[in-house]
Amino acid sequence: MANKNYRFETLQLHVGQEQADPATDSRAVPIYQTTSYVFHSFDHAEARFGLADPGNIYGRLTNSTQGVFEDRIAALEGGTAGLAVASGAAAVEYAVRNITQSGDHIVAAKNVYGGTFNLLRHTLPRDGITTTFVSAENPQEFEDAIQENTKLVYFETFGNPNADLPDFEAITAIAHKHHLPVIVDNTFATPYLFRPLEHGADVVVESATKFIGGHGTTLGGVIVEGGNFNWAEVPGKFPTLTEPDPSYHGLNFYEALGGSAFVTRIRAILLRDTGATLSPFSAFLLLQGTETLSLRVERHVENALKVIDYLKTVPEVESISHPSIEGRKDNELYKKYFPNGGGSIFTFDIKGGKDAARVFIDNLHLFSLLANVADAKSLVIHPASTTHSQETLEELEDQGIHQGTIRLSIGTENIEDILDDLKGGFAALRESGLAK
């Protein structure tokens, strides 16, 4: 695929297996269901374990089905290297831990997925890694929060759950001025709608469970490296990448591997030691989803914008959180960064608070009440009592999550059926008299 600049829709079908499988002539990517691999000789085995010869060593680290998936997502994101792991949460933690240690500091947007918020707020501090949370709407807050021991800046393409947008280029410029890498979670946008590496990000993480898999069947995560960040620019700033690693006989990952050092170290060290490995079958299922990613995302976005137009007409709706709405702070950013639209996962606030939300949700029949998002099926949830329930009321309010906040993940069903289901929920709410 390197000899021609194929477009996204072609890349999502072909990268990683441009020709039939050499062992079987299978056109589909085979499921290499194995734990280990035969080395050709004593020297071959030694070279593999020493990272002198890239290739399969053991199933915890690499697998050929997984390798195709990694290459494909890296190509779609425009990166130099990719690593697939067992979940999106594992991808986030590995990416962060790869360049942090006790005594280090992170600057992160406060409007992130609840699991990521808990990782940064509660789990990492136990290991001596602290985070300052700032508003993604205000790039200056990122700069004001940077300390001498800050190691990275972290935010999401679309905030979770309110679909609010950061100013990517402004924030990444600030981070790079201070010699800091930017890690962006691109789960809610996907590389089809937005490629963070083209707007200043250095590392992209995604929950492949969501749009990439697309059908609510498979957990997975992916980390993609941009390959342009100079980890050695500030001596001693990123010792895990620029200083000798004793577990690899003094290997300096950045010197040896350059633009793939970040991802390779995660595979060689973190995945080796903690083993959040993606199974070959999961990699196969995620590849099936990847092949139709653009088609599904177009339909998700088309349906979502029609749902938003409908919600604007409903008197029981207090507010809608979506960057496509004129007058919002991030509407100009939406027009700039998302010319083809985006944001099929968003929230609205319903009059009547939690009790009204309960009636509305319990009277939906097409929408499934569950914690996942970006399924082909339409989904609904009440964040304050579920996905973000471990946060304090103050933290929830600070993130724009209220007792009347409802998150929708708009699927690919017929739009009239989606709207009919929502109308049924609002009809039940009116009958209850709770929407006051």
For each feature predicted by the language model, list its residue ranges.
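Conserved PLP-enzyme active-site core in the AAT-like
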Residues: 2-3, 16-20, 83-313
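N-terminal "arm"/small-domain region of PLP-dependent enzymes with the aminotransferase-like
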Residues: 2-63, 71-72
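Conserved N-terminal alpha-helix of the aminotransferase class I/II PLP-enzyme fold
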Residues: 41-93, 115-123
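PLP-dependent enzyme catalytic core of the Aspartate aminotransferase-like
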Residues: 121, 148, 296, 362, ...
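Structural preference for beta-strand elements that scaffold enzyme active sites
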Residues: 152, 181, 203, 319, ...
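Short hydrophobic/aromatic beta-strand micro-patches
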Residues: 224, 347-349, 409-411
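Conserved small-domain helix->loop->beta segment predominantly found in fold-type I
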Residues: 274-277, 281-283, 288-292, 297-299, ...
